Amino acid sequence: MAPLVFNDLQALKELVGREIGASEWFSVTPERVDCFAEATGDRQWIHLDHERASKESPYGGTIAHGFLTLSLISHLMKDVMEIRGGVRLAVNYGLNRVRFPAAVRTDSRVRALVTLLALKELPDCAEAIYAVTVEIDKSDKPGCVAEWIVRYYP
């Protein structure tokens, strides 16, 4: 699925309050979880020890770090939309209301559903707030929900 392309921020502004779209499904592999553990130093057994997690964890196996799931949002967003004009730089400004309603099991697939909540002009940039739900394939609960704040500089 190709991303929705906006020629400028004004075109994006027309979608305030509406769902923009969904990303492609993305596999959360054990190798990715291992790399994230190495990069962050978070080596809890629930993420890395498949045998122990199968026996002792309430999830029946290893799970992705919540922060790994959260960090995938910027990657998944590339599948959803692209702004081609009037923006030289997009900066991750922060997050609101981050929650992890369900664990993302290793080897499961996730995708992002994105809604534009707000887009406002600031003195030196524009600020967008997106509601992002990271869905887990074959799960009733999402792996992550968050409001993502992005600043766009001309």
Describe every region a protein language model picked out.
Residues G21, W25-S27, R99, I149-R151:
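Generic structural detector for well-ordered beta-strands
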Residues M1-L15, F100-P154:
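HotDog/MaoC-like acyl-thioester-processing domains
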Residues A2-A64:
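Catalytic strand-loop segment that frames the active site of acyl-thioester-processing enzymes
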Residues S57-A64, S71-L113:
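Hydrophobic beta-strand-centered segment that forms part of the acyl-chain substrate-binding groove
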Residues D34-A37, L70-S74:
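Predominant activation on well-ordered alpha-helical scaffold segments within soluble catalytic domains
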